[in-house]
Amino acid sequence: MKVVAFERQQQGTGASRRLRNAGKTTGIVYGGEVAPQMIELDHNALWHALKKEAFHSSILDLEVAGKSQRVLLRDVQYHPFRQLVLHVDFQRIDPKKKLHTKAPLHFLNAETSPAVKLSSAVVSHVVTEIEIECLPADLPEFLEVDLSKIEAGQSLHAKDIALPNGVALTAHVDAENPVIASATIPAGAVSDEAAAGEGETPAA
Protein backbone atom coordinates (compact mmCIF):
# COMPACT_ATOMS: atom_id res chain seq x y z
CA MET A 1 0.00 0.00 0.00
CA LYS A 2 1.46 3.35 -1.07
CA VAL A 3 1.33 6.53 1.01
CA VAL A 4 2.41 9.92 -0.31
CA ALA A 5 3.76 12.51 2.12
CA PHE A 6 5.69 15.76 1.92
CA GLU A 7 8.62 17.12 3.89
CA ARG A 8 7.53 19.42 6.69
CA GLN A 9 9.69 22.49 7.13
CA GLN A 10 7.83 24.29 9.91
CA GLN A 11 7.33 22.92 13.41
CA GLY A 12 5.50 23.98 16.54
CA THR A 13 1.88 24.36 17.61
CA GLY A 14 1.20 27.35 15.38
CA ALA A 15 2.61 25.64 12.31
CA SER A 16 0.60 22.48 13.02
CA ARG A 17 -2.58 24.52 13.34
CA ARG A 18 -1.93 26.25 10.01
CA LEU A 19 -1.36 22.89 8.34
CA ARG A 20 -4.63 21.52 9.75
CA ASN A 21 -6.47 24.58 8.46
CA ALA A 22 -4.96 23.82 5.05
CA GLY A 23 -6.23 20.23 5.13
CA LYS A 24 -2.93 18.65 6.15
CA THR A 25 -1.90 16.31 8.99
CA THR A 26 1.52 16.31 10.61
CA GLY A 27 3.60 13.19 11.03
CA ILE A 28 7.03 11.78 11.76
CA VAL A 29 9.08 8.93 10.32
CA TYR A 30 11.66 7.40 12.66
CA GLY A 31 13.85 4.33 13.07
CA GLY A 32 16.81 2.78 11.34
CA GLU A 33 20.11 4.56 10.79
CA VAL A 34 18.45 7.71 9.44
CA ALA A 35 17.45 10.75 11.49
CA PRO A 36 13.73 11.25 12.22
CA GLN A 37 11.92 13.05 9.41
CA MET A 38 9.05 15.49 9.87
CA ILE A 39 6.31 15.06 7.28
CA GLU A 40 2.85 16.28 6.34
CA LEU A 41 0.07 14.33 4.63
CA ASP A 42 -3.23 15.14 2.95
CA HIS A 43 -5.81 14.78 5.71
CA ASN A 44 -8.69 13.43 3.62
CA ALA A 45 -6.55 10.77 1.93
CA LEU A 46 -5.13 9.76 5.32
CA TRP A 47 -8.59 9.64 6.94
CA HIS A 48 -9.88 7.22 4.31
CA ALA A 49 -6.71 5.11 4.46
CA LEU A 50 -7.06 4.76 8.23
CA LYS A 51 -10.46 3.12 7.75
CA LYS A 52 -8.73 0.17 6.06
CA GLU A 53 -7.53 -2.59 8.37
CA ALA A 54 -4.52 -3.28 6.15
CA PHE A 55 -3.25 0.28 6.65
CA HIS A 56 -2.74 -0.50 10.33
CA SER A 57 -1.23 -3.97 9.95
CA SER A 58 0.71 -4.02 6.68
CA ILE A 59 4.07 -2.71 5.57
CA LEU A 60 3.51 0.58 3.74
CA ASP A 61 5.51 2.20 0.95
CA LEU A 62 5.88 5.79 2.12
CA GLU A 63 6.99 8.23 -0.55
CA VAL A 64 8.53 11.49 0.63
CA ALA A 65 10.12 13.94 -1.82
CA GLY A 66 10.22 11.27 -4.51
CA LYS A 67 12.00 8.72 -2.33
CA SER A 68 10.23 5.58 -1.10
CA GLN A 69 10.81 3.90 2.25
CA ARG A 70 9.10 0.92 3.87
CA VAL A 71 7.34 1.72 7.13
CA LEU A 72 4.76 0.56 9.65
CA LEU A 73 2.08 2.79 11.14
CA ARG A 74 2.89 2.98 14.84
CA ASP A 75 0.60 5.62 16.32
CA VAL A 76 -2.37 7.82 15.41
CA GLN A 77 -3.58 10.79 17.42
CA TYR A 78 -7.21 11.80 16.90
CA HIS A 79 -9.04 14.94 17.97
CA PRO A 80 -11.13 14.09 21.09
CA PHE A 81 -14.50 14.96 19.52
CA ARG A 82 -13.98 16.05 15.90
CA GLN A 83 -13.38 13.77 12.92
CA LEU A 84 -9.80 14.92 12.70
CA VAL A 85 -6.43 13.18 12.65
CA LEU A 86 -3.93 15.31 14.54
CA HIS A 87 -0.69 13.37 14.03
CA VAL A 88 0.69 10.04 12.80
CA ASP A 89 3.92 8.14 13.53
CA PHE A 90 5.59 5.79 11.06
CA GLN A 91 8.53 3.50 11.85
CA ARG A 92 11.06 2.49 9.21
CA ILE A 93 11.62 -1.24 8.97
CA ASP A 94 14.78 -3.27 8.48
CA PRO A 95 14.13 -6.39 6.36
CA LYS A 96 16.66 -8.33 8.46
CA LYS A 97 15.24 -7.42 11.88
CA LYS A 98 12.16 -8.93 13.51
CA LEU A 99 9.13 -6.74 14.03
CA HIS A 100 7.05 -6.61 17.18
CA THR A 101 3.57 -5.53 16.15
CA LYS A 102 -0.14 -6.30 16.49
CA ALA A 103 -2.01 -8.45 13.98
CA PRO A 104 -5.81 -8.26 13.60
CA LEU A 105 -7.79 -11.42 14.36
CA HIS A 106 -10.45 -12.63 11.93
CA PHE A 107 -12.87 -15.03 13.63
CA LEU A 108 -14.39 -17.70 11.37
CA ASN A 109 -17.04 -20.45 11.50
CA ALA A 110 -18.70 -19.53 14.80
CA GLU A 111 -22.14 -20.14 13.27
CA THR A 112 -21.28 -23.78 12.51
CA SER A 113 -19.75 -24.54 15.91
CA PRO A 114 -21.37 -26.95 18.42
CA ALA A 115 -21.67 -24.01 20.82
CA VAL A 116 -24.02 -22.17 18.48
CA LYS A 117 -25.75 -25.03 16.63
CA LEU A 118 -26.37 -27.33 19.59
CA SER A 119 -26.47 -25.01 22.60
CA SER A 120 -27.50 -21.62 21.17
CA ALA A 121 -24.47 -20.15 22.90
CA VAL A 122 -23.09 -16.69 22.21
CA VAL A 123 -19.50 -16.63 20.99
CA SER A 124 -17.69 -13.51 22.21
CA HIS A 125 -14.49 -12.11 20.74
CA VAL A 126 -12.50 -11.13 23.82
CA VAL A 127 -9.69 -9.48 21.84
CA THR A 128 -9.54 -8.34 18.22
CA GLU A 129 -5.75 -8.25 17.78
CA ILE A 130 -2.70 -10.03 19.18
CA GLU A 131 0.97 -9.13 19.52
CA ILE A 132 3.32 -11.08 17.28
CA GLU A 133 6.93 -11.04 16.13
CA CYS A 134 8.30 -11.90 12.70
CA LEU A 135 10.54 -10.68 9.91
CA PRO A 136 8.94 -8.04 7.66
CA ALA A 137 8.64 -10.52 4.78
CA ASP A 138 6.55 -12.84 6.98
CA LEU A 139 4.18 -10.20 8.36
CA PRO A 140 0.56 -11.38 7.94
CA GLU A 141 -2.16 -8.88 7.14
CA PHE A 142 -4.35 -10.70 9.68
CA LEU A 143 -4.62 -14.01 11.56
CA GLU A 144 -7.57 -16.38 11.20
CA VAL A 145 -9.15 -17.98 14.26
CA ASP A 146 -11.24 -21.07 13.50
CA LEU A 147 -14.20 -21.31 15.90
CA SER A 148 -15.82 -24.34 14.24
CA LYS A 149 -15.06 -26.72 17.15
CA ILE A 150 -15.75 -24.48 20.14
CA GLU A 151 -18.40 -25.81 22.53
CA ALA A 152 -20.58 -24.05 25.09
CA GLY A 153 -18.55 -23.13 28.16
CA GLN A 154 -15.23 -23.35 26.31
CA SER A 155 -12.67 -20.65 25.61
CA LEU A 156 -9.95 -20.32 23.00
CA HIS A 157 -6.56 -18.93 23.97
CA ALA A 158 -3.76 -17.21 22.10
CA LYS A 159 -1.83 -20.46 21.69
CA ASP A 160 -4.82 -21.96 19.86
CA ILE A 161 -4.21 -19.65 16.90
CA ALA A 162 -2.70 -21.42 13.88
CA LEU A 163 0.25 -19.13 13.14
CA PRO A 164 1.81 -18.92 9.66
CA ASN A 165 5.42 -19.99 9.17
CA GLY A 166 7.86 -17.44 10.51
CA VAL A 167 5.33 -15.85 12.86
CA ALA A 168 5.36 -16.25 16.65
CA LEU A 169 3.52 -14.76 19.61
CA THR A 170 5.59 -12.26 21.55
CA ALA A 171 7.18 -13.68 24.70
CA HIS A 172 4.74 -12.11 27.17
CA VAL A 173 1.67 -13.14 25.14
CA ASP A 174 3.02 -16.68 24.89
CA ALA A 175 3.58 -16.74 28.66
CA GLU A 176 0.18 -15.30 29.58
CA ASN A 177 -1.76 -17.18 26.86
CA PRO A 178 -4.80 -14.87 27.17
CA VAL A 179 -8.36 -15.81 26.23
CA ILE A 180 -9.25 -14.61 22.74
CA ALA A 181 -12.80 -15.99 22.41
CA SER A 182 -15.38 -17.68 24.62
CA ALA A 183 -18.75 -19.40 24.18
CA THR A 184 -21.39 -18.83 26.84
CA ILE A 185 -25.08 -19.64 27.09
CA PRO A 186 -27.13 -16.51 27.86
CA ALA A 187 -28.59 -16.43 31.38
CA GLY A 188 -32.13 -16.23 30.02
CA ALA A 189 -31.63 -19.33 27.91
CA VAL A 190 -30.32 -21.26 30.92
CA SER A 191 -33.36 -20.25 32.99
CA ASP A 192 -35.74 -21.24 30.19
CA GLU A 193 -34.12 -24.66 29.84
CA ALA A 194 -34.30 -25.23 33.60
CA ALA A 195 -37.96 -24.21 33.71
CA ALA A 196 -38.76 -26.53 30.81
CA GLY A 197 -37.05 -29.39 32.62
CA GLU A 198 -38.98 -28.76 35.83
CA GLY A 199 -42.27 -28.68 33.93
CA GLU A 200 -41.82 -32.11 32.42
CA THR A 201 -44.03 -34.86 33.91
CA PRO A 202 -42.36 -38.25 34.39
CA ALA A 203 -43.89 -41.04 32.31
CA ALA A 204 -46.14 -43.43 34.25
Swiss-Prot record:
Annotated gene: rplY
UniProt keywords, alphabetically: Ribonucleoprotein, Ribosomal protein, RNA-binding, rRNA-binding
Any matching Pfam family: Ribosomal_L25p
Molecular function per GO: 5S rRNA binding; structural constituent of ribosome
Name of the protein described by the UniProt record: Large ribosomal subunit protein bL25
Disulfides per UniProt: none
Complexes and interactors: Part of the 50S ribosomal subunit; part of the 5S rRNA/L5/L18/L25 subcomplex. Contacts the 5S rRNA. Binds to the 5S rRNA independently of L5 and L18.
Keyword Ion transport assigned: no
GO cellular component: cytosolic large ribosomal subunit
HAMAP family: Ribosomal_bL25_CTC (MF_01334)
Gene Ontology BP annotations: translation
Family to which the UniProt record says this protein belongs: Belongs to the bacterial ribosomal protein bL25 family. CTC subfamily.
Native organism: Burkholderia pseudomallei (strain 668)
InterPro entries: Rbsml_bL25/Gln-tRNA_synth_N, Ribosomal_bL25/Gln-tRNA_synth, Ribosomal_bL25_b-dom, Ribosomal_bL25_C, Ribosomal_bL25_long, Ribosomal_L25_dom, Ribosomal_uL5_bac-type
CDD domains according to UniProt: Ribosomal_L25_TL5_CTC
Function: This is one of the proteins that binds to the 5S RNA in the ribosome where it forms part of the central protuberance.
